[in-house]
Amino acid sequence: MKIVILGTAYPYRGGLATFNERLARQFQAEGHDVEVVTFTLQYPSFLFPGKTQYSNEVAPTDLRIKRWVNSCNPFNWVSVGRKIRKMQPDMLITCYWMAFFAPCYGIIERIVKGNGKTRCLALVHNMIPHEPSLLDKLFAPFYVKSTDGFVALSDSVVKDIDKLDKCRKPKTFSPHPIYDHYGERMSKAEACELLKLDADKDYMLFFGLVRAYKGLDLLLDAMGKMHDKLPNLRLLIAGEFYEQEEGYREQIKNLGLTEKVIIRNEFIPD
């Protein structure tokens, strides 16, 4: 089968890029012909709160990745749709996670399906984002109408799709897989030595981008209530802050956790 995956990938960084690249490799391992189409412009800078959108790792040599899509340029969407239509893929998989991309994906899908061959499958991480906006109601239905079927990575996302899918298109729930590309496990002692942590302490990990909806403030409150009972416990916050770090540091200070919380405010690569 000839498959085109449309979504974020190298040179962009993050979990979604990792997911799409791992998916492409799995399809290749199963004998399919796979190409990944990603962005020349993913987010305008004013929509991206982090330090950089780009990976500093070496480009993958085992994947065919084309940087074609400008998420903000409708003329580009038409051009990309025509290019993919000419490729005559059996399946176009659009990797969807927020309504900002719905017009772009929806236009491209409609054009690609003009070849009378390609089926469009939505691989949905979030139908309604963790931080909803008016865009969800305006744009998401347009995308849903252009898609032939859905794979959702959580049961709640299936329910969100049902609210928008008036045609009752095929959809299935496939739990988000566990990543298997991080290498061999190591002992706690080895890990603590590499990370320059005290191996005699117990660690609780908050890992990933720090955003308000993820509840770090609640975790800190909980730790403030239990740290006297668990004097050996330390909290390691490892990830880039998409919120103001100062507010969390003030909370840590007020809760008396300054010596018990370790912050690594940086993006953690694969």
Regions found by a protein language model. Give the residues of each.
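Nucleotide-sugar donor phosphate/pyrophosphate-binding loop at the beta->alpha transition
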Residues: 116-121, 127-146, 159, 186-189
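Glycosyltransferase donor-sugar binding loop
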Residues: 39-43, 207, 234-247, 266
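Nucleotide-activated donor-binding/catalytic signature segment of Leloir-type glycosyltransferases, i.e.
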Residues: 246-267
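Donor nucleotide-sugar binding/catalytic pocket of nucleotide-sugar-dependent glycosyltransferases
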Residues: 145-186
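A short, glycine/small-residue-rich beta-strand->loop->alpha-helix junction that serves as a flexible
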Residues: 7-22, 44, 97-102, 214
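A short helix/loop element that forms part of the nucleotide-sugar donor recognition site in Leloir-type
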Residues: 183-197, 250
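N-terminal strand-loop element at the rim of the active site
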Residues: 9-13, 25-86, 157, 162, ...
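Conserved donor-binding/catalytic core segment of Leloir-type glycosyltransferases
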Residues: 198-214, 220-223, 236
